[in-house]
Every structure is written in C-alpha cells, then in structure tokens.
Amino acid sequence: MTDIKQILTDLIRFPSITPEDAGCQKYMIQFLEQLGFTCQQLNNGPVSNFFACYGKIGPLLVFAGHTDVVPVGEVSKWDTDPFSLEEKNGVLYGRGVADMKGSLACMLHMARRFIKTYPSFPGRLGFLITSGEEGDEFNLGTPYVMQKLEQQGIVIDYCIVGEPSSSLKAGDIIKIGRRGSLSAKIHLSGKQGHVAYPHLADNPIHRISPVLAELTSMQWDNGNAYFPPTSMQITYIHCGGHAGNIIPGELNLHLNFRYSTEQTDESLKTRVINAFTHHNLNPAIEWRLNGEPFLTNKGILLESCKQTVLEHIGTLPELSTSGGTSDGRFIAPYGVEVIELGLVNATIHQVNECTSLQDLNTLETMYFSICEKLLID
C-alpha cells in the first residue's frame, strides 16, 4: 500500500506552478475514484478544479486545498531539485511540501484508511481542490466551485482547509478565521507644468498629501477578541513626469486593507471617500474585494479539532486569525463551519521549503480522528 511519503513524492513531481495543475488533480482524481468517490471536474479557464464526494446522505465534511505552488525562484539556490522529493534526517524537501501538497498527501492517505476502516459510515466525505489559490486567478477556483455546488444543491456542513497553519509542530495552531482584504486603485488627475510656474499647473502630489496624512493616521477600529485592529497600507505610488523640473499631471496610488469583523468593505470605502471629499478631491477609485473576514469561534468542527489536537500532541491548539487570506473566505459565507489545520509554515514560499515526516504522520492521524468524531461518533 502506498504510504504518505510516496503519495507526496508523486505529487511533488508535478511542476504545478500557479495556475497550472500539471497533472496533480488527475492523479488525485484517479486515487479517489479507486476508493469509490464520485468526482466532477469544474475547470475554469487556466484554473483546474474538482469536487469529489463519498457517500450519499448525512453530514458532509470537506477537505479543501490547492495543487498549485508558487515559483521556485533561483533553482541554483536550492540544495535539492524542488520538484523531486528528498529526505534528509526525517525532513522532506521540495516545492509545495508544506504549502500544501503535504496536507493533500495526508488527506488522500487518510481517506483511503478511513473508508477501509468504515466502508459504510453514516455521512459524506468530500474534497474541494483548485489550482488557482496562489496567484491572481483565485476567483476562477474555489469561489467558482462553491457557486457550482450551490447550483447543484450540495451543502457542505464542515470544511477543513489544509493550509499550513502550524508554527512549531503540526496542530499547535488552528486558524479559526481570517481577516478580510480590500484593495483600491486610485487615480488623481492634475495638470502638468514647469516647476518654476506652479500657478500654471496643478500638482496631484500636493493635493493628495493631506488625504494620505489623514488616512495613515486613522484608527479604523480597535479589533476584538479574535482579530487585531484593521490596518491600511499604501502599497504603490506613481506619478508622471520623470524629470526634476516637471510638475506631474497625474498620480496613481494603491491601498490595501486587512480588516476585522468590526468593519465591512462598504464601511471602509465610505471612510476613504469621505477623506477625499473633505479635501475637495474626487479621484477615480477602482475597488477590489479580495475576501470578507470569516470566523468559526464555536461549533462541532472546532470542538472536534481542539479535542483531537489535545489527544495527539498533548496540548490544546492556539486559536488564531493571523496571517494572510485563504480560500476559507470563499467557503464560510455559505454557512459552513471552516477551520484551517495543516503543517508548519516556517519555510513556505522559500528556497528549500520543507516539512518533517513526523508532522505528516501526525497530521494524517489527526485528520482521521476528526473524521471519526464528525462522521462516526
């Protein structure tokens, strides 16, 4: 029988740099179909997606994840071939071993073991997999699949996202939510002119400066028990001109908010627009909602996960909402209990990305135990 390491070896061989899947999902679908899963591919443009389900009735527990990985960077800086799994002293190296093909290998191995142990369990086990998580095509992935499932009347009860949530060892941190992300591209027009004749020009830098001073000093909220205060960062400023004696005629500015459940995207938009209005400016603003905040601070899934972690590593997990966004933000709005439980994130997106064989085995065992609690007990 193929063990977890061999499954991971197979997955790492696919150079699935986002949004390319490169054969990962074909491998996973074949694996799951051999176990009796019904699989449907839901590809969308350059992004590959599939949903798989075992069982006909009862609560539906879905394991969600992505097959795409970030680029490897300079291959010469790797100590190993990034697309060939290599073990050194119990540590496994390769692009995606932690984020998140290691979790996928645990999910597949667990599914086979669970179905062999409980072939007629009173529930349903599912997989929701995309190759569009790491890049700009994320809207073609999980949110698209969720729309299709809703159209088919498929309701997910519980979802475990296999993102690398842990800090020192598998299970020490569970993500119970994530902050929302809102971006703005702002264009402010002025009038180009010579610096010696400012009365004949209109400098957009000068005009926007008091607005930026107001926005960067603003206390958006105080956060709450689960989220830190909302933050805003200026991520890009560019003006025309490119000469020391020219007043630029336009300015482009990008902002990003990471916001708590104390805010909504509309409340943030209103405050930004009001700041510009207060200074008699009316720029063109293009908004992009990358994801709303979500929180699973209670429920059967969370309690099952907490108890499972305690049983397997001896301590209760830290419950956190820190870090960037994840695809959980597209699943939670459908009323699903969502948590993230995965491997250690210390080396994700880095050269020599790695995870330990011990953590893989621990994570697989925890996934199995959670399935028992939700689908058997």
UniProtKB/Swiss-Prot annotation:
<dbReference type="GO" id="GO:0009089">
    <property type="term" value="P:lysine biosynthetic process via diaminopimelate"/>
</dbReference>
<feature type="binding site">
    <location>
        <position position="349"/>
    </location>
    <ligand>
        <name>Zn(2+) 2</name>
    </ligand>
</feature>
<dbReference type="GO" id="GO:0019877">
    <property type="term" value="P:diaminopimelate biosynthetic process"/>
</dbReference>
<dbReference type="GO" id="GO:0006526">
    <property type="term" value="P:L-arginine biosynthetic process"/>
</dbReference>
<feature type="binding site">
    <location>
        <position position="134"/>
    </location>
    <ligand>
        <name>Zn(2+) 2</name>
    </ligand>
</feature>
<keyword id="KW-0479">Metal-binding</keyword>
<dbReference type="InterPro" id="IPR002933">
    <property type="entry name" value="Peptidase_M20"/>
</dbReference>
<dbReference type="GO" id="GO:0008270">
    <property type="term" value="F:zinc ion binding"/>
</dbReference>
<feature type="active site">
    <location>
        <position position="68"/>
    </location>
</feature>
<comment type="subunit">
    <text>Homodimer.</text>
</comment>
<keyword id="KW-0378">Hydrolase</keyword>
<protein>
    <recommendedName>
        <fullName>Succinyl-diaminopimelate desuccinylase</fullName>
        <ecNumber>3.5.1.18</ecNumber>
    </recommendedName>
</protein>
<dbReference type="InterPro" id="IPR011650">
    <property type="entry name" value="Peptidase_M20_dimer"/>
</dbReference>
<dbReference type="GO" id="GO:0050897">
    <property type="term" value="F:cobalt ion binding"/>
</dbReference>
<keyword id="KW-0862">Zinc</keyword>
<keyword id="KW-0170">Cobalt</keyword>
<comment type="pathway">
    <text>Amino-acid biosynthesis; L-lysine biosynthesis via DAP pathway; LL-2,6-diaminopimelate from (S)-tetrahydrodipicolinate (succinylase route): step 3/3.</text>
</comment>
<dbReference type="GO" id="GO:0009014">
    <property type="term" value="F:succinyl-diaminopimelate desuccinylase activity"/>
</dbReference>
<keyword id="KW-0220">Diaminopimelate biosynthesis</keyword>
<feature type="binding site">
    <location>
        <position position="99"/>
    </location>
    <ligand>
        <name>Zn(2+) 2</name>
    </ligand>
</feature>
<feature type="active site" description="Proton acceptor">
    <location>
        <position position="133"/>
    </location>
</feature>
<dbReference type="InterPro" id="IPR036264">
    <property type="entry name" value="Bact_exopeptidase_dim_dom"/>
</dbReference>
<dbReference type="GO" id="GO:0008777">
    <property type="term" value="F:acetylornithine deacetylase activity"/>
</dbReference>
<keyword id="KW-0028">Amino-acid biosynthesis</keyword>
<keyword id="KW-0457">Lysine biosynthesis</keyword>
<comment type="function">
    <text>Catalyzes the hydrolysis of N-succinyl-L,L-diaminopimelic acid (SDAP), forming succinate and LL-2,6-diaminopimelate (DAP), an intermediate involved in the bacterial biosynthesis of lysine and meso-diaminopimelic acid, an essential component of bacterial cell walls.</text>
</comment>
<dbReference type="Pfam" id="PF07687">
    <property type="entry name" value="M20_dimer"/>
</dbReference>
<comment type="similarity">
    <text>Belongs to the peptidase M20A family. DapE subfamily.</text>
</comment>
<dbReference type="InterPro" id="IPR050072">
    <property type="entry name" value="Peptidase_M20A"/>
</dbReference>
<feature type="binding site">
    <location>
        <position position="99"/>
    </location>
    <ligand>
        <name>Zn(2+) 1</name>
    </ligand>
</feature>
<feature type="binding site">
    <location>
        <position position="163"/>
    </location>
    <ligand>
        <name>Zn(2+) 1</name>
    </ligand>
</feature>
<dbReference type="Pfam" id="PF01546">
    <property type="entry name" value="Peptidase_M20"/>
</dbReference>
<dbReference type="InterPro" id="IPR005941">
    <property type="entry name" value="DapE_proteobac"/>
</dbReference>
<feature type="binding site">
    <location>
        <position position="66"/>
    </location>
    <ligand>
        <name>Zn(2+) 1</name>
    </ligand>
</feature>
